[in-house]
């Protein structure tokens, strides 16, 4: 089973296309949607929904995949649920770069303060990070520096931030899922 978390643009048709591409790895791809506007509510909703989806599956190696803001959540929710995650162009600082786009971006800082201390060290090796060199939203060199000591980093030379085409990375995601 693959749980897919969309980014800030929840209604983008690209989300459906990415889910179709992920079906080459696993026929059971499930969208886990969230508001994107209310971080504290989103966290509780995602924890509950992912837990429910895991209980309904007999997959011994489920993964959670997120793009952009979805990758922010995939890392945390994956850690809290004990499953591995794939982070595609993760937004690591939504409390800074979501100002003006959501009602309470400061809630992200509050969530980070309440998260398990040094959770990345405890989650080491349990995430695969795919970063675009042509990401027009994130500073992915900085993302690589922040996450490289904890997770495997894979660079993509072509895709923009929303990463519409996963094809060249599907074999790597599949190996990571089965590892």
From Swiss-Prot:
Stored InterPro entries: AB_hydrolase_fold, UPF0227, UPF0227/Esterase_YqiA
Gene3D superfamilies in the cross-refs: alpha/beta hydrolase (3.40.50.1820)
Family statement: Belongs to the UPF0227 family.
Annotated protein name in UniProt: UPF0227 protein Ssed_2836
Annotated organism of origin: Shewanella sediminis (strain HAW-EB3)
UniProt lineage: Bacteria, Pseudomonadati, Pseudomonadota, Gammaproteobacteria, Alteromonadales
